[in-house]
Amino acid sequence: MLDAQTIATVKATIPLLVETGPKLTAHFYDRMFTHNPELKEIFNMSNQRNGDQREALFNAIAAYASNIENLPALLPAVEKIAQKHTSFQIKPEQYNIVGEHLLATLDEMFSPGQEVLDAWGKAYGVLANVFINREAEIYNENASKAGGWEGTRDFRIVAKTPRSALITSFELEPVDGGAVAEYRPGQYLGVWLKPEGFPHQEIRQYSLTRKPDGKGYRIAVKREEGGQVSNWLHNHANVGDVVKLVAPAGDFFMAVADDTPVTLISAGVGQTPMLAMLDTLAKAGHTAQVNWFHAAENGDVHAFADEVKELGQSLPRFTAHTWYRQPSEADRAKGQFDSEGLMDLSKLEGAFSDPTMQFYLCGPVGFMQFAAKQLVDLGVKQENIHYECFGPHKVL
């Protein structure tokens, strides 16, 4: 526990943090990667270049300082970050490195004096221990469950299937022939790659796209413009190739009773965790209402349409609606979509009027903000809306 003086000293730095903004974390990362370049093998350097990770870390630091007297308020954020850390295989000793550079950054940017540095050192130590302990629990859970493992495990690509002009699915089975750990629908795999020509090891998280079967995993990858890893997977990864995986993780997952109605809302590749949820509901014979609402640019980039239709047919109460923002003439001729333009949930209000319905969202942040606002305006309770950001977390 932190003493009152330490808490007061940390809280007194909040105005300075707010004034500085993400420039603080930019300095921190630049310093850390200069002095500890080995950490480039762990961090997603693409998120460093576009500034997303720097913004996410700044928001986390500011939230900690603001809630330092009420740590339980931070537990949802801690869980999200700890789950992600396990896919990077973060170790306790790496927290010492981060702490060293955080304090040095505060000193170099603000020269706040030893009292402030000591207070932040104590505060960081408390938070680091929270993460270390929770991550140890997750590592132990992953290693001890049936089919689980520690660290990375070699998996072979056994199928590679284009699903649209931009999305390709990969089916993976363990090289050792053993069973694989189950997961909750909505969670992701940590994929570790360092192909020839890559300057650093790259680690990515890809959502699992079907119900666990104990034998292998399926992910789907969108080709991102300029994306080093996604383009390598699309262009160079082949059936028979071996990749390293970390056990499934993630705090975004569906856990509902059979009589709980569910709405799955997605855009683009955001449908991937929803597929695992839909597959799970279909194979469980879910009896309550299930809605599938999806937005795509057009038919060329609309993946898994046939699979969704087939899964929906096995559910007794299923409604699907697809929006194409800019459908082609071929799309119109085929009748592959229901509405043109942006997703408008007000026209489907009757499909989710049950106050117990749970809503799961995934897609670009702007889309999720747009969809979540519509739901709230239609009377949906905020606590019934669950969402996942691909990349560093953002608040809707």
From Swiss-Prot:
UniProt KW NADP keyword: yes
Cofactor detail note: Binds 1 heme b (iron(II)-protoporphyrin IX) group per subunit. Binds 1 FAD per subunit.
CDD domains assigned to the protein according to its UniProt record, in alphabetical order: flavohem_like_fad_nad_binding, HmpEc-globin-like
Positions of disulphide bridges: none
Gene Ontology BP term (one): cellular response to nitrosative stress
Residue intervals of the Globin domain: 1-136
Similarity field: Belongs to the globin family. Two-domain flavohemoproteins subfamily.
Entry function: Is involved in NO detoxification in an aerobic process, termed nitric oxide dioxygenase (NOD) reaction that utilizes O(2) and NAD(P)H to convert NO to nitrate, which protects the bacterium from various noxious nitrogen compounds. Therefore, plays a central role in the inducible response to nitrosative stress.
UniProt name for this protein: Flavohemoprotein
Organism: Escherichia coli O157:H7
UniProt lineage: Bacteria, Pseudomonadati, Pseudomonadota, Gammaproteobacteria, Enterobacterales
Gene behind the chain: hmp
